[in-house]
Amino acid sequence: MATVSLIEYADASAEVKAVFDDIKRTRNVKDVNNFWKALANHPATLKRTWEAVREVMQPGALDPLTKEMIYVAVSVANNCDYCIHSHTASAFAKGMTPAQYEELLALVGMASETNALASAMKIPIDAQFLVEAGK
């Protein structure tokens, strides 16, 4: 059950409608999903979040499918059911195969396990793994 109301387009302020319109136009969808409807309770958060998502998810050095798969991985790591479902659906729509999804989940699981072990053991970082800015 949601902890905030979902703001429908008909009930939205002009400021929220403008963001909703941009989301619908950018994503070529008839309606915005529940995430955006929930954020509409705080128009400034809605606008800021949409602008950041729109910028980060636009085509760039990483292709759109790779970006969605990264979003799935982070969502699994953060245990966000909504984000797991929405970004998995988006990744499949962008061409992710079931085999890629299975491999992605196996990778997330392994990374979580090895990260926990390395953190718990406070393993010192090998010199060849140290990354410096600009290198």
Identify the residue ranges that each predicted region occupies.
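Hydrophobic alpha-helical segments
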Residues: 1-135
